[in-house]
Amino acid sequence: KTSSKTLLGKMKTNPEFKIPSIGSEGFYVDSDVWYLLMRNIQNQVNTMLIGATGGGKTELVLLACKKLGISCSVYDMGSMYDPVAGLLGVHRLQKGGVSVFDYAKFTRDISKPGVVLLDELSRAPVTTNNILFPCLDSRRKLPVEIAGGEDLREIEVHPECCFVATANVGVEYTGTMSMDRALVGRFFPIELSYMPPEQENKVLVKRCGISLSDATIITKVANSLRNMYNKQEISSSISTRETLMVGDLVADGWDLVRAMELVLLPLFEGTRSDGERGIVCRVISSR
């Protein structure tokens, strides 16, 4: 039993920290994960959410920030091909040939209270690490050595700024960089797994407006394929994002089986009778 005098006890009794519900937000999160994330954000503990893609990691962080009433600046690290320009800034020529350093938005976001979300950090270029290291350790500073003249060369991270990262795991995620142990070690890891089937059923019913029987079949097929992926029988898993896609098609009038085929089959190679795609077809037909 949790004492009401501890931080966890206070959060559990405070309505402001209420766990998101399927009924109100259409979102399910394990209570331990929720309170741990809220505690870390409040205490400015760098946190990394680790789990399969499409599992709601980004949405979870946005929900937490909304509950806490703080800003959340999202950075898509997977598409940041030039980390120096994206995180520090660039020199721009003004009239008369004068060079002015244009600081990146990141430098302003870390200078104010709130959460800086490094989304899909596992897909970021390796050069990102050296830029982020001083921000994430006890220094809490961002060196901007490329700024010239009298421009500010070092930016302090605001005491109430918290870094949260998301990372996809699994060999099927193309573009995923092998994460530097020194980078991972600067974060508090929180692992997210797929939600229990009965909860995923409720999410599908709530968000898509489909029947419980259809939702149950979608979840059953998805979990069968997830189990096969865990056994390395197929090369890709099925995310909640994809089960929601199926649910939306069913809600819009597509036949349940056809909806599953349209969403799930393109994720796998082979034909309807051979290869991984054939395996998926058999799982769908044996629902």
Positions of the model-derived regions?
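Alpha-helical lid/collar subdomain of P-loop NTPases
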Residues: 1-27, 43, 196-202, 206-287
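AAA+ P-loop NTPase catalytic core and its hallmark functional loops
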Residues: 1-216, 220
